[in-house]
Design a protein with these regions (language model features):
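A short, active-site helix/loop in glycosyltransferases that binds the activated sugar's phosphate group
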Residues: 56-67
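Divalent metal-coordination and catalytic microenvironments
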Residues: 6, 28, 52, 92, ...
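Cap/insert and terminal regions of metallo-dependent hydrolase folds
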Residues: 117, 125-227
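Short glycine-/acidic-enriched loop or helix-start segments at secondary-structure transitions
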Residues: 5-8, 35-37, 63-64, 130-131, ...
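Structural beta-sheet core signal
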Residues: 24, 52-54, 119-120, 195
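Active-site metal-binding motif and surrounding structural segment of the metallo-beta-lactamase
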Residues: 1-53, 149
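Core dinuclear metal-dependent hydrolase active-site scaffold
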Residues: 1-16, 78-140, 144, 225-231
Length: 231
């Protein structure tokens, strides 16, 4: 749950056993990304006036589900760069991406620090649609255009057919296999790419698996719980 995740964050940052974030940013409204925010409310953490940044459609869904009470809601517009709180030391930019938008639209978030920047892209449908939307020819071209040093990208599934008899077109994500095919080996000047958001069926969750070893041999990484990135 949220309390466990905040405990992991606090320990990773040397902040004790728990923390309340200075601000919250949301990419979209699918179940695993928003339902936990209710725990910021009076029944659990007792939060009030926490700055929240999301698109207008995400904020609308939160209000309809009565999840917005603990927050001071701020609409983030795609392409605008802003500081979430005064003196926080970093800026954010929301970047529109296509992803099963039945409830709200979906954004990646670029985090811009004093020395480095990071792209947070946990969910999108496929690279073809995303690259067309942002007007770039390849993943590398897109990352170069943003000047990012790190990219935490959608690694939900390793390959097609991973869900057994379930129709995977109903839960579209670019597979890690497809992403690696498009990227090939890491080249000089490439950002550090870290695959995140792995489903429990993904064999790359096992660091000793042949899949995880192959990914590492190309120069890419799988995200690790509690890791930190200095920007």
């Amino acid at each position: 749950g949220l309390a466990h995740q905040l405990s992991i964050a606090a320990k990773s940052l040397g902040k004790g056993d728990s923390l309340v974030p200075d601000s919250v940013s949301l990419t979209h409204c699918h179940l695993g990304h928003v339902d936990g925010v209710g725990q910021f409310g009076k029944e659990a953490m007792g939060g009030s006036g926490i700055p929240l940044f999301a698109s207008s459609s995400v904020i609308q869904v939160l209000e309809e589900r009565r999840l917005a009470t603990p927050f001071q809601n701020n609409v983030a517009h795609s392409g605008n760069v802003f500081s979430p709180t005064v003196g926080c030391g970093f800026e954010l930019e929301f970047v529109r991406v296509p992803h099963r938008d039945e409830y709200s639209d979906t954004h990646a978030i670029r985090v811009i620090g004093p020395n480095h920047s990071l792209l947070f892209l946990p969910d999108h449908d496929d690279w073809g649609q995303t690259l067309r939307l942002v007007g770039e020819q390849s993943i590398r071209d897109w990352f170069i255009s943003m000047g990012i040093d790190f990219a935490m990208i959608d690694g939900t599934f390793w390959s097609d057919g991973e869900l057994g008899g379930r129709d995977m077109t109903r839960v579209p994500h670019p597979t890690i296999s497809e992403s690696m095919e498009l990227l090939g080996e890491r080249r000089e000047g490439d950002p550090e790419i870290i695959f995140i958001h792995l489903n429990h069926t993904n064999p790359a969750l096992d660091g000793d698996s042949s899949q995880a070893r192959y990914l590492s041999s190309l120069g890419w990484k799988i995200g690790e719980q509690g890791s930190t990135i200095l920007l």
